[in-house]
């Protein structure tokens, strides 16, 4: 007997869970289909375990780089990788349990398996047929790999979280935030780390101040940066080590190589053709601002649409979709402009709005006013490992409306959220000037710039 639902989500990641729970709250009969652990990339091989590892790297840096100058005897003989991984796993298990409890409370049927479209209203899962009035595709994405000889000897970001031990020498290939974060974590935990980027610097899409400062810190503290580095091949040596060969003849031998060159949509195994759902040339599902596909009753949110690939974006889009479909809000949709972003690098980065070059291109040089601040983070200022903290406000027009906020330095990851609200509300430089600073903090620089 075919089972029918009001709403089905294919994919138990951030977007699917958020949307299906919101729909269930409005009395819809819902099902969630997921073949792996709940939580998708973010919880299992992304944001959550990455942040745990970032904290671990911070602790090691505090002990070895900063502790002695604060007067602490920091002689430590051992770092236990297994203990760290066990603690991380236990934390993720608690998140899985939380998801299961909420879905159960909302009477959502969780179906373990892979879904494939039979037609626009019908899915096949584990040999059984189910139908729905509304179907959400939230299958997410997966790491990309280069097409070069020996690519199989490397791992990707998923594989990093399965490492049984910390390698002594690691190469990370990629210039985006995932590559920067992984390289920073591995370097912070004490491995000899190399970061290979195709052009002159990592994070080239960020404001130049961010990229330039990050390169400055990397040159001082690691990881070792290799620019204009285009991989040609990977060779596995007799001792188990790997040699990454570059097109220009350079090479580096390491114990572990991590591909972090980008991600691609995971849409290819659900038989989209049977439903008639359109994808673009890169395989991303084409949606409008309401998350509608070209087929009525089929929607998509998250990384498989090619939108901003961040967990809160998928969550927000999924919830707004359910509000529109099931709570009588016909115009509800996510505004994809001015989405704040944090990179958990060393030091962390926060950014929202337009970069300085983007603002100058959009508004013209004569309409743009930029305010900057550069100082040494207090946390490091009393030590021999001093680290820069740099901030920038990008303003436009006679009223100096703030259209971009950018920073790199200690605490930037936690301070950006509130400033993003201000930018989203249309704050001006005068609004910031009229806000009394909190002292002594790094955040006060944003309201005291001249």
Swiss-Prot record:
Query: Which Gene3D superfamilies does the UniProt entry name for this protein?
Result: 3.30.390.30, FAD/NAD(P)-binding domain
Q: What is this protein called?
A: Glutathione reductase
Q: Give the GO molecular function terms.
A: FAD binding; flavin adenine dinucleotide binding; glutathione-disulfide reductase (NADPH) activity; NADP binding
Which keywords are on file for this protein? Answer: Cytoplasm, Disulfide bond, FAD, Flavoprotein, NADP, Oxidoreductase, Redox-active center
Family, as annotated: Belongs to the class-I pyridine nucleotide-disulfide oxidoreductase family.
Against PROSITE patterns, the record matches this protein to: PYRIDINE_REDOX_1 (PS00076)
State a GO cellular component annotated for this protein.
Answer: cytosol
Which sites bind glutathione?
A: 14, 99, 319
Q: List, alphabetically, the Pfam families matched.
A: Pyr_redox_2, Pyr_redox_dim
Cofactor binding notes? Binds 1 FAD per subunit.
In terms of pH, how does activity behave?
Answer: Optimum pH is 7.5.
Question: Quick one: which residues bind NADP(+)?
Answer: 175, 178, 181, 198, 204, 262, 309, 342
